[in-house]
Design a protein with these regions (language model features):
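Short, flexible turn/loop "capping" segments at secondary-structure junctions
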Residues: 55-56, 159-161, 356-360
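Active-site nucleotide/adenylate-binding loops and adjacent lid/helix of ATP-dependent enzymes
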Residues: 2, 113-206, 210-228, 232-255
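A conserved FAD-binding loop/helix module that cradles the flavin
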Residues: 293-295
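Peripheral (often C-terminal) accessory segments that flank ATP-dependent C-N-forming ligase machineries
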Residues: 3-9, 307-391
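Phosphate-binding core of ATP-grasp and ATP-grasp-like enzymes
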Residues: 184-240, 246-279, 283-291, 307-316, ...
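ATP-binding N-terminal substructure of ATP-dependent carboxylate-amine bond-forming enzymes
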Residues: 1-122, 126, 141
Length: 391
């Protein structure tokens, strides 16, 4: 991915206040991007099919259309100086078609890599970074051969699409394999997929790295807890061996330089019981596990993303205070709102979504603390998240 100056052949060295940033996707990530950009003086446009979506509520204008509507993407580009996106399932070809109208400093190479799990794994491995063992599979026959090599337990994922556990099948035994056989086409084929071996991890973690196409900085490594395949809680910083932390920062910088990163990249990690760092997935955008940075860091992930795509300089972010971030899903809206008056320490973020649904991310709460373990216990003791209690 080029810097903004390279993307525009020197026409724009850096984006200045008053310029317009067009965001593809109008959910909470786009909303928080837009809020950061507005503080810096930028105008905001958004493309989203839902009128008055969360991003549109804080934007200057909205193009209301589907994400793959090339005419709508062109309209957004014509009204913008720079394009960015809040999720990775964006039509990369469509972005390439409008780059003469608006710069796309993130480029499309990173999009194409992260849209295909096989390409993603290859890129990560080619840059000297370990992943779980994996094999590309397109049929039951190929799956059986891959299982002979990787063994149970393993997880079968579609090569593209899927989030929060969607498009995934856990294989623990022959009985699970039989279910895949039953769903396959008559010739044994199924959607292009990847089989990944299970990692015996101590905990899940993530690290954010930001770049402007030339310079790169990393945020603290955080510990993540998922429940029902959805991120539940992030603890910053993660308590871990300094050598392991250094390795994680180095691999993040290595991947960022490999992409010539402009904007932010989230790297989901497994930290194994023998202190190895394994990369799970990449996300070429701000990440749920980085929301704590809004209160806890010298500048947050959304600031870093906007500065990166605008060609502004980047300073190494500092953790000002440890923090715990917990997601507020649809079923948690009522109980958390009922307790807001009792918890002045809660930094409450509501995404202003029109429809409240079970398991839908509606907001988050961040607590700054000197004792993350106590804060975790205090949050759980409220009972707001009892439906997500560990089995």
């Amino acid at each position: 991915m080029p810097s903004l100056s390279e993307e525009t052949n020197g026409r724009i060295e850096r984006l200045m206040p008053g310029a317009t940033i067009g965001i593809i996707g109008g959910g909470q990530l786009g909303r928080m991007m837009a809020l950061s950009a507005r503080y810096m003086g930028f105008r905001i446009g958004v493309l989203d099919p839902t009128p008055d979506c969360p991003t549109a509520q804080v934007a200057d204008f909205q193009v209301t259309a589907e994400y793959d509507d090339i005419a709508a993407i062109r309209e957004l580009a014509e009204k913008s100086d720079v394009l960015t996106y809040e999720f990775e399932n964006v039509d990369a070809d469509a972005i390439d078609q409008v780059r003469s109208l608006a710069a796309a400093p993130q480029g499309t190479d990173l999009l194409r890599v992260t849209q295909d799990r096989v390409n993603e794994k290859r890129f990560i491995n080619d840059h000297g970074t370990p992943t779980a063992p994996w094999k590309a599979v397109n049929s039951v026959e190929e799956l059986e051969a891959a299982l002979d090599e990787i063994h149970y337990p393993a997880v079968l994922k579609t090569r593209s699409g899927g989030y929060d556990g969607h498009g995934q099948t856990v294989l623990k035994s022959e009985a699970d394999l039989e279910q895949v056989r039953a769903r396959a086409d008559h010739d044994g084929s199924f959607l292009p997929s990847i089989l990944e071996g299970f990692v015996d991890f101590a905990f899940e973690a993530s690290i954010l790295v930001a770049g402007n196409g030339k310079d790169y900085v990393t945020f603290p490594i955080v510990r993540n807890e998922h429940r029902n395949n959805i991120l539940h809680m992030t603890i910053a910083p993660a308590e871990m061996d300094e050598t392991v932390a250094k390795e994680a920062h180095e691999l993040a910088l290595r991947l960022a330089k490999g992409f010539e990163l402009a904007g932010i990249l989230a790297i989901e990690l497994f930290i194994t019981k023998d202190n190895k760092v394994i990369v799970n997935e990449l996300a070429p955008r701000p990440h749920n596990s980085g929301h704590y940075t809004i209160e806890a860091c010298s500048f947050d992930q959304f600031d870093a993303h906007i500065r990166g795509i605008a060609g502004w300089p980047l300073e190494q972010p500092q953790l000002l205070k440890p923090a715990v971030m917990v997601n507020v899903l649809g079923q948690h809206v009522a109980p958390t709102r009922a307790l807001i008056a009792d918890h002045p320490e809660w930094n409450v973020h509501d995404y202003c979504k029109a429809e409240v649904r079970h398991d839908r991310k509606m907001g988050h709460i961040t607590v700054l603390t000197d004792d993350t373990a106590k804060t975790v216990a205090d949050l759980e003791a409220t009972g707001c998240w009892d439906d997500l209690k560990k089995a």
